[in-house]
Amino acid sequence: MAYNQEDSKRLSDKYKKEGHFDKLKREILSNPWNNTEENSESFEQALRKRVASTVKEMVNEDEELIFKNRGLTSALIESQLVKDNYLKLGSKMEGDNGDGEKKFDLDVYVRSKLQDPKLLEMIKGQLQETLNSYEEEANGST
């Protein structure tokens, strides 16, 4: 069967609706972000700490942020984080001992997780199941 771009979009939408994307996100967020330490916190916990620390630094630099509209402040902070590809999150965090051990690189972490062969096989399997379900629905409606 030949597939087109519209079929790809439908498959992607179905994959998301079945909750596979959310499961994948939870899987990545719940993994320890620093496997070199015992009892390493989850990636989500580390990310939350980094965001909180970065926002605190930003407010210290520009106290006017706390007096602005909440939505505007959120948008300003988000744009500051996004514009440099989240590099601000990798800067030294309060409590780091300066030894460089706790370098936090969001992009490197996510890419490494997405290149994990086990995870890729799981995604391929889920996509195949979703495709089979999609084809069954398409054949049943014709």
UniProtKB/Swiss-Prot annotation:
InterPro entries: BOD1/SHG1_dom. Its main location: nucleus. It is found in: Nucleus. Present with 1520 molecules/cell in log phase SD medium. GO terms for biological process: chromatin remodeling; subtelomeric heterochromatin formation. It comes from Saccharomyces cerevisiae (strain ATCC 204508 / S288c). Component of the Set1C/COMPASS complex which consists of SET1(2), BRE2(2), SPP1(2), SDC1(1), SHG1(1), SWD1(1), SWD2(1), and SWD3(1). GO terms for cellular component: chromosome, telomeric region; nucleus; Set1C/COMPASS complex. The COMPASS (Set1C) complex specifically mono-, di- and trimethylates histone H3 to form H3K4me1/2/3, which subsequently plays a role in telomere length maintenance and transcription elongation regulation. Keywords: Nucleus. This is COMPASS component SHG1. It holds the Pfam family COMPASS-Shg1. Belongs to the SHG1 family. The keyword DNA repair does not apply.
